[in-house]
Amino acid sequence: MTDDLEPTAPAAAAPEPEVKGIDLARRALEEARAAAKASGKSVGQGRRSGTGVRALRARRRRGWSGPGPDDRDPQPFGALTNAIAKQRGWSPKVSEGTVLGRWVQVVGEDIAAHAEPTGLRDGILSVSAESTAWATQLRMMQSQILAKIAAAVGDGVVKSLRITGPTAPSWRKGERHIRGRGPRDTYG
């Protein structure tokens, strides 16, 4: 018996089923990586930063962190807020708030007992002293106070100080008034 069958042409390749969803994305990624590799570029392997679910599961499987510091250890709240402030560009405002809010820790209890900050605008810190003598003393200590502030919050936050003494008492009553004859001898 002979084969009377004619050799047939190879069967046409069956059409590929339509690819959808995640399979389509995978194929596109593989093609892009192959094209990059063919052109001699470095081929990325996706995220390796350790922020996804896989990295979290891998960390859980890793076990105890050991005696050294680890990124899983509790972090101070201040470090977190500083990172957020830097990330969002709030650092200058936070530094200004630190000078005004933590005045006692920044300059020391001695100075803080006799002077208080009243405002900070354009790098000029306004300080009100409780007496004229303390205002004079603070003016002489101005460079040391600026050094303490720079050490606490950084250079450039406070460039100079405007130190004022107490204001004189006023006998003015109400918003409308007539100029009087002066204070006269009211102290006996």
From Swiss-Prot:
Biased composition (Low complexity): 7-16
Entries under PANTHER family matching the protein: UPF0232 PROTEIN SCO3875
Record family assignment: Belongs to the UPF0232 family.
Taxonomic lineage from the root: Bacteria, Bacillati, Actinomycetota, Actinomycetes, Mycobacteriales
UniProt protein name: UPF0232 protein RHA1_ro03670
Region (Disordered): 1-20, 31-78, 166-188
Pfam families found in the cross-reference section: DciA
